[in-house]
Amino acid sequence: MFAVIYKFKVKEDMNSEFIQAWKQLTQLIYEYEGSLGSRLHKETDNSYIAYAQWPDKETWKNSGDKLPDNANEVRRIMKECCTRIEILNELDCIEDLLKSKTKVN
């Protein structure tokens, strides 16, 4: 398994729009590109950390061309909500002891 850690700095008063666009884009990537999903965490009022899981680095690197046309609009909205988007880490999983019993929301 492979994981990518992202950091998003969101513009004032754009948090709800950002979260909605992030959810929509993440769902599309999961459905069409073979990701294993992602989690979004709030760091500060306008800063978020997400990690996305993939079967392997190659699947992640080759993703992007299978998305439906509406993904471009969702991506544009998400980017417009942010002052900065960066990849903090690209990580190969050594051990996985994470279990999810409940979902947030």
Listing of model-derived features with the role each one plays in the protein:
Residues 27-36, 53-89:
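An amphipathic, aromatic/His-enriched active-site/gating alpha helix that lines ligand/cofactor pockets
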Residues 2, 37-49, 72-105:
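Glycine-rich beta-strand-turn "strand-cap" elements at beta-sheet edges
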Residues 6, 18, 22, 38, ...:
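Hydrophobic pocket/interface hotspot
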Residues 12-37:
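Short amphipathic alpha-helical segments
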Residues 2-8:
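Active-site-flanking beta-strand signature of metal-NTP-handling nucleotidyl enzymes
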Residues 15, 47-53:
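Intrinsically disordered, low-complexity regions enriched in Ser/Pro/Gly/Gln/His and often acidic
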Residues 11-13, 43, 55-59:
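Short coil/turn motifs at secondary-structure junctions
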